[in-house]
Amino acid sequence: MTNADTVAARTPPPKLKTPALAVLFATVFINLVGFGLVVPLLPFFAQSLKAEAWQITLMFSAYSLGQFFAEPFWGRLSDRIGRKPVLLMTLIANALGYLMLAFVPNIWLAIAVRLFTGLGAGNISTVQGYVADVTPPEQRAGRMGLIGAAFGLGFIVGPGLGGLLTQPQLGRLGYQLPIFLAAALAAVAAVGVVVFLRESRAKADPAAPRPAFLAGLKDARDNAVVSRVLVVTLIYMAGFSAMESVFGLWSESRYQWGAREVGLSFMIVGIVSTLNQGFFAGRLARRFGESRVLATGMLLFG
């Protein structure tokens, strides 16, 4: 047993009290609200920077690319140095990313800033790790469900609010208002982490072996069920992301929509998705089987 294991065994983890749970809920909620706030305005904001269509889609991809690479990194780092500092660093990075986006002078800097913001947004696994650290096994599913609810609620509120706050008639300021709000929310969540969260994990022994990211991918590849689920999820998310990146441009060309209409459309998607996951998917899967429900969902999505 290492020294870190001994310390962890002697020091019980803090109980997950209401303020701490609220901060964790807010962290996930803010990640999705911040993402959703800028989704409806990004195409039009990029057009104000004289961006071409392919550059606009690249700006969307940059955020997701950063999040993809950052998620396992932040998770492993939180195992080493603790959950609280990682949550604080990612929230500060989010706030800085949104502030920089508001003032970028050209599309290439906007793409770089979106990549940076995505790197700071990959903290969902850290939140889940904190919940697992301080929650008894019999309560863990319920607590994780709350985190999932924050995810869904954030994607409902964010696009709708972003669309309503965008005021193109004000020029650049009309696009900056939702971005400033996203930055302010991230800053408030960072303060909440400092004030209300106790560290849930003892600092790890630097000499202790740590699981490698590529080893995890190999394990997933060797498990037939997991690998198939990952492939299906990848295809689904790729399709959704492709639609998301061009929807604003397409709806503007086809229906003369602006950020408000695009935001409300994504808000409706969030509402339907949350209702489906929370109330219908489980019941339908128990009645008709998971494979049939999954296949039907994919067909409806297409």
Give a label for each model feature:
Residues G36, S64-P72, G122, F155-I156, ...:
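Residue-level signature of mid-helix packing/kink "hotspots" within the transmembrane helices
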Residues V7-T18, R198-V231:
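Juxtamembrane intracellular "pre-TM" segments in multi-pass secondary transporters
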Residues F68-I107:
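Conserved MFS/SLC helix-loop-helix module at the cytosolic interface between two early adjacent transmembrane helices
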Residues A184-K203:
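C-terminal membrane-cytosol helix-exit motif in multi-pass small-molecule transporters
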Residues A70-G82, N276-E290:
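Helix-to-loop junctions at the C-terminal end of transmembrane segments
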Residues P40-W54, S245-V262:
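Short amphipathic helix-loop junctions that connect adjacent transmembrane helices
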Residues R80-L91, R286-M298:
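Cytoplasmic membrane-interface "Motif A"-like loop-to-helix N-cap segments
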Residues A112-G152:
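Cytoplasmic helix-loop-helix junction between adjacent transmembrane helices
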